[in-house]
Amino acid sequence: MFKILTIDDDPAMTELLTLLLKTRGLDASMANSGEDGIKLIREISPDVVILDLMMPGMDGWQVCTEVRSFSNVPILILTALDSPGMVASALDAGADDYLVKPVPSGVLIAHLNTLTRRAGTDKSIKNQISINAATLPV
């Protein structure tokens, strides 16, 4: 089963994303801090990480840098920060993709599919889920 880890300091966001992904048959886990997220990446070896940038303690940029020291897991940034400088700095820190909240669920799923295809994984979420027009809030 396809494993996705969401790391965001907002429990409502991680719960919403986890529910959205689980209702589509995916193995979704969550962490509400960068430190806990790194521990989970080591423990469960997710296929994709969805990561917020602005978090207390270890922020998303720091998480990207740390994860890149031990893993090539695709990292999708999902944040409210929309300036070109933020996008560039996240990609420079090791992120693979960047989306700005709010995002339609279909767009999120399409980006997850692209990341798995680029990673060359044998798993595909394309056939596991249906896409609808729901939009994830900020």
Model-derived regions, located:
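Receiver (REC) domain active-site loop signature in two-component systems and cognate sites
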Residues: M55
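Active-site beta3 strand of CheY-like receiver
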Residues: I44-I50
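C-terminal output helix
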Residues: G85, P102-T116
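Conserved acidic segment of CheY-like receiver
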Residues: M1-A12, L17-L21, V49
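Short, Lys/Arg-enriched segments at the junction into DNA-binding effector domains
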Residues: K3, T116-V138
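Active-site residues of response regulator receiver
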Residues: D8, D52, T79
